[in-house]
Amino acid sequence: MNPSEMQRKAPPRRRRHRNRAPLTHKMNKMVTSEEQMKLPSTKKAEPPTWAQLKKLTQLATKYLENTKVTQTPESMLLAALMIVSMVVSLPMPAGAAVANYTNWAYVPFPPLIRAVTWMDNPIEVYVNDSVWVPGPIDDRCPAKPEEEGMMINISIGYRYPPICLGRAPGCLMPAVQNWLVEVPTVSPISRFTYHMVSGMSLRPRVNYLQDFSYQRSLKFRPKGKPCPKEIPKESKNTEVLVWEECVANSAVILQNNEFGTIIDWAPRGQFYHNCSGQTQSCPSAQVSPAVDSDLTESLDKHKHKKLQSFYPWEWGEKRISTPRPKIVSPVSGPEHPELWRLTVASHHIRIWSGNQTLETRDRKPFYTVDLNSSLTLPLQSCVKPPYMLVVGNIVIKPDSQTITCENCRLLTCIDSTFNWQHRILLVRAREGVWIPVSMDRPWEASPSVHILTEVLKGVLNRSKRFIFTLIAVIMGLIAVTATAAVAGVALHSSVQSVNFVNDGQKNSTRLWNSQSSIDQKLANQINDLRQTVIWMGDRLMSLEHRFQLQCDWNTSDFCITPQIYNDSEHHWDMVRRHLQGREDNLTLDISKLKEQIFEASKAHLNLVPGTEAIAGVADGLANLNPVTWVKTIGSTTIINLILILVCLFCLLLVCRCTQQLRRDSDHRERAMMTMAVLSKRKGGNVGKSKRDQIVTVSV
């Protein structure tokens, strides 16, 4: 075989791989398990909560106790990691039963309403014109016109009689009322000049008894300036209405039925015959357009009024005052002057002017009252949150103490387009309700951030590296701390605002009640502040409840209390009636429930959950602090040095004493030896030379 053939049959040479390192790197990256992919349904893990960390600490402590291992920070950490690994690795059994824990919860400002009753304090009703209607003004209402007239069906309960206006049982009936200023004249044919305003008001119950007077009640007379019987001096030269509150001689009864008795001590002027000094039979019948059955029709069509008689006409109860109804039976409540502002704005007011003339007929004086009107003014009255007006076919049922209304409308303003075929019910937002809430874990209170900070302060401010160890704990407390801080700032700001508004309102009442023109912008700002105070008052009451209660750590908008819900003691029908606002014998006893919950909260205030565990962890972390070690070593070295010095001193003293004893012993031995040598010699030193004696003695 020639060399060329041998060369052709030789095996081919292997090519060297230059990319062995990249292949090895890829082999190292190969895995046999399934690749973990992030799915759209995958949720981001939340930071550990305080309850989870506390439970983990408890489980780790129990595990170490069962295994009889000393509880050190290192062993606690390893036990906690082992428990977490077991919990994560073990699958959740399908159909596992979830424990159910039901506690009482306080929900502030729920989306519920309740009726404003005669026992509530008067509310703020704003008008757009304070020249003809006294009271706070605001021409920017409604605040949200797009929300006016929203449909609603209500079924709510009440304890005290609710405030309702309209033609329905349990509601105050509307009527037309006149307010007149009487100015005397000196003309021989004119006795008085009149300026009068007619508008919608509240209808009294009229009993045509002797002299056709209204039925009056002399009970529950309020304190105040009585209305004058004669024309006030300040009214003799004025042509404008000056509203001034006064108390009439007797009260008008506005309602007296199964819903209660409501009276009004405001004056209600009317024309009557002055029969003083008359020898003939003088009819004392009162003729007044104050009460008209046709309501708005009398204000629209009747533009001229004339009264004629052979006897002089007099206007009774000379003061211009607004109605102030109040309930006196079955309970006695405060006056509500704001209701008149709602009724007077339901239709325009009419302005009248006229006089009373004196003529002679059949040789007798003849008196004529002539009133004419050519001016009407539309008005608007509004309420602001948390108050609202429910308008519709309202039905009040006193037997069941419920109020129902289907297809009603929610309004905040009433104007001259209102139809009195409907009724007006004043409502407001509920301040808070108590309801049972179900949880899948036991109730646990929030840890005390103050105690936690005090316990860990010595660790955190000495060793910065421990901050990374405590990140998990602190992350669970950020939400609680932020909530507490915001609540504290809100309370502080609210108190400051209340004081500021109270200081600013000292001189505002006289300004609002006067008829002089005021700056509209300033008035709107003051009204906003007044309404803000009312709203903040409700918020402060809710915040006060929150401060008195111990709440679960995982709630911020409402408070889950430690009081367990007992179905046998408070069945759901009682809770339902409470949500409806009904308060009767079958309704949830809120006062008793509050007392039980406050007692349970007090019991939990003395026991701050997790404090012992936190203190143990802090002590363990403090032992790991190198600074502590250095301090311990330093203090131990000083003590040891002192002890060593003392020992050395004692040892030196012993050595010196030993040496001295040895010297003394040597001297005694030498002396004894010398004595022995001398005693063995016969004759002693006799016959010896002096030198030999000295040598012998020295030896």
Curated annotation (Swiss-Prot):
Question: Which residues point to the Extracellular side?
Answer: 90-632
Task: Give the Basic residues compositional bias ranges.
Answer: 10-20
Under the heading CDD domains, the entry gives: HIV-1-like_HR1-HR2
Which residues are the signal sequence here? Answer: 1-89
Give the start-end ranges of region Fusion peptide: 466-486
What ranges does the record give for the region Disordered, renumbered to this chain? 1-47
- Sites carrying sugar chains: 100, 128, 153, 274, 355, 372, 461, 507, 554, 566, 585
Ranges per topology, Cytoplasmic = 654-699
- Marked site (Cleavage) residue numbers: 465-466
Q: Does the keyword Oxidoreductase apply?
A: no
TM helices/strands, residue ranges: 633-653
Give GO cellular component annotations, separated by semicolons: plasma membrane
Recount the PTM note.
Answer: Specific enzymatic cleavages in vivo yield the mature SU and TM proteins.
Where does the source fall among the domains of life? Eukaryota
Q: Which family does it belong to?
A: Belongs to the beta type-B retroviral envelope protein family. HERV class-II K(HML-2) env subfamily.
**Role played:** Retroviral envelope proteins mediate receptor recognition and membrane fusion during early infection. Endogenous envelope proteins may have kept, lost or modified their original function during evolution. This endogenous envelope protein has lost its original fusogenic properties.
The remark listed among the other comments is:
Insertional polymorphism. Provirus present in 16% of tested individuals. Has a type 2 genome. The HERV-K(HML-2) family contains type 1 and type 2 genomes depending on the absence or presence of 292 nucleotides at the 5'-end of the env gene resulting in Env proteins of distinct sizes. Despite their overall retroviral envelope structure HERV-K(HML-2) type 1 envelope proteins lack a predictable signal sequence. Subgenomic RNA transcripts coding for full-length envelope proteins have been detected for both type of genomes.
- What's the name of the protein? Endogenous retrovirus group K member 8 Env polyprotein
The organism named in the record is: Homo sapiens (Human)
Task: Give the encoding gene's name.
Answer: ERVK-8
